[in-house]
């Protein structure tokens, strides 16, 4: 059995806001590494649960920003980690294919414009507003095109609510209640890790009964986002049309600033 673990950092217990990369103070450096540690521990809980559920292979995708956030020296040595930045359109979920039995998501956050949610961003607009997707549910849809069910996620209460609505049966582990863009009422990290472990086991056990999240084409896709994680939202590019969500996503991403033609000397830790 193969399990794919998609990760982000904004949804981990204890995270409320980013460090200031323009200020190399002790507090900012410590904050960044503290968030890395919190993310690593939650990912380790998910990895252990996957192997305890009978997984033969577990892929961990370090998907936040630089792709260099998880302290991989501290990960369970049985898993493999996908990290770094490919600067191309089709590498957001590398190594996710139809051979994967289930996808798990750790550290998820709400879409842009969601009231009272932690650092909300990335609001994917489908068919001119008929549906909106977060990064989390976009990952579910891309996996769905491959026939892979998304069985579990962790994050704040707002992203858990969206995932439950769109993916019936998914196990949603709320590790914090978001109070505003930069404030939360969080579980203590050790408790969050315990619940993530239990949630991953429960989700994997349900993998045959949770249907892949599939969006029927043809589709029109655009991305709305904002500065500083607060409204107003603005369209980030030109609307694309395609037969599947995967094709639409790849076409849109190919037009954005982090693709190869737009970057000469990339700073891997700067986004985009």
Regions found by a protein language model. Name each.
Residues 14-19, 43-98:
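Glycine-rich nucleotide/cofactor/substrate-binding loop typically near the N-terminus or early
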Residues 7-12, 63-64, 106-111, 157:
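Short glycine-enriched loops at secondary-structure junctions
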Residues 77-93, 129-132, 170-181:
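Acidic, His- and aromatic-enriched active-site or binding-groove loops in soluble protein domains
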Residues 90-149, 154-160:
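Internal, conserved structured core segments that host functional sites
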Residues 192-272:
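C-terminal accessory domains and tails appended to enzymatic cores
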Residues 1-53:
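N-terminal glycine-/serine-/threonine-rich phosphate-binding loop
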Residues 44, 48-56, 105-109, 148, ...:
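Generic secondary-structure signature for well-ordered alpha-helical cores
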Residues 144-150, 154-206:
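Active-site rim beta-loop-alpha module in soluble metabolic enzymes
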């Amino acid at each position: 059995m193969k399990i794919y673990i998609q990760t982000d950092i904004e949804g981990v217990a204890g995270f409320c806001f980013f460090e200031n990369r323009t200020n190399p103070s002790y507090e900012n450096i410590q904050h960044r590494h503290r968030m890395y540690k919190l993310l690593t521990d939650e990912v380790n809980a998910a990895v252990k649960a996957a192997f305890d559920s009978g997984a033969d292979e577990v892929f961990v995708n370090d998907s936040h920003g630089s792709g260099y956030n998880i302290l991989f020296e501290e990960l369970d040595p049985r898993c493999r980690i996908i990290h770094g930045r490919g600067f191309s359109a089709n590498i957001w979920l590398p190594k996710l294919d139809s051979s994967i039995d289930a996808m798990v998501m750790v550290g998820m956050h709400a879409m842009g414009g969601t009231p009272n949610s932690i650092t909300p961003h990335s609001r994917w607009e489908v068919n001119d507003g008929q549906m909106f997707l977060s990064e989390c549910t976009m990952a579910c849809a891309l996996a769905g095109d491959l026939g892979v069910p998304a069985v579990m996620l962790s994050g704040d209460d707002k992203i858990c609510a969206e995932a439950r609505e769109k993916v019936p049966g998914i196990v949603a582990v709320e590790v914090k209640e978001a109070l505003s863009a930069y404030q939360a009422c969080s579980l203590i990290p050790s408790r969050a890790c315990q619940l993530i472990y239990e949630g991953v086991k429960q989700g994997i056990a349900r993998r045959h009964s949770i249907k892949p999240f599939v969006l029927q084409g043809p589709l029109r896709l655009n991305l709305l986002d904002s500065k500083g994680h607060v409204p107003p939202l603005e369209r980030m590019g030109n609307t694309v049309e395609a037969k599947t969500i995967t094709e639409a996503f790849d076409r849109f991403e190919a037009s954005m600033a982090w693709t190869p033609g737009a970057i000469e000397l990339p700073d891997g830790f700067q986004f985009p």
